[in-house]
Design a protein with these regions (language model features):
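Hydrophobic/aromatic beta-strand elements that line small-molecule binding cavities or substrate pockets
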Residues: 10, 60-65, 90-97
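Hydrophobic pocket/interface hotspot
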Residues: 19-20, 29, 48, 63, ...
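Short, highly charged C-terminal tails/helix-capping segments
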Residues: 135-153
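Beta-strand/loop substructures that line and gate deep hydrophobic ligand-binding cavities in soluble
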Residues: 81-127, 146
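Short, charged/polar surface micro-motifs in flexible loops or helix N-caps
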Residues: 54-57, 65-72, 78-80
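Intrinsic-disorder/low-complexity, polar/charged segments enriched in Ser/Thr/Lys/Arg/Asp/Glu/Gln
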Residues: 3-9, 47, 58, 71, ...
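A short, structured loop/turn motif at beta-sheet edges
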Residues: 16-17, 64-71, 95-104
Length: 153
């Protein structure tokens, strides 16, 4: 079966623990991810939601695997756009590997569907979000483009 996949690798001057917190804790995500935050208990098998600033659920799914501070796997479905939601669930994997004074972050977002609209969308969004995360951890300042939820969404 054909699938769609987006892979992004970056190196961030931080510790695995700090990067893990930045990926999972609302006080961090709101700073670099357009004011969004996760709602979950961060236990395997539990529900996961990505909340947007007005309280709507942007994306939802389940925590599939969690190995703090090394690996996080989420089942992920868009909740905003009916045609994207209809594609069903994707899988998003974060791998954190210490590399001296840095951490190698590998993100793989994939779906068992050829030419997935969701994977097309996240391939546009993840580079900006993860660049802003890197900037926040290395300089203390997120990128301006990701500080606020886009108007009209």
């Amino acid at each position: 079966m054909a699938k769609s996949e987006f892979v992004y690798v970056t190196y961030i001057r931080t510790t695995p623990e700090r990067l893990w917190d930045a990926l999972t804790q609302p006080e961090f995500t709101r700073a670099y991810w357009c004011e969004c935050w996760h709602e979950t208990t961060w236990e395997a098998g539990t529900a996961w939601k990505l909340m947007v600033p007005d309280g709507r659920v942007g994306d939802s799914g389940e925590v599939v695997e969690i190995d703090k501070p090394r690996r996080l796997v989420l089942q992920w479905r868009n909740e905003f756009l009916p045609e994207v939601q209809a594609e069903g669930f994707s899988r998003c994997t974060f791998e954190l590997e210490p590399q001296g004074s840095m951490v190698k972050l590998t993100l793989v977002h994939e779906m068992e569907k050829a030419e997935s609209k969701l994977i097309g969308m996240v391939s546009q969004g993840w580079p900006t979000i993860l660049s802003s995360l890197k900037s926040l951890l290395e300089t203390g300042e997120a990128l301006e483009a990701t500080k606020h939820w886009p108007k009209g969404m």
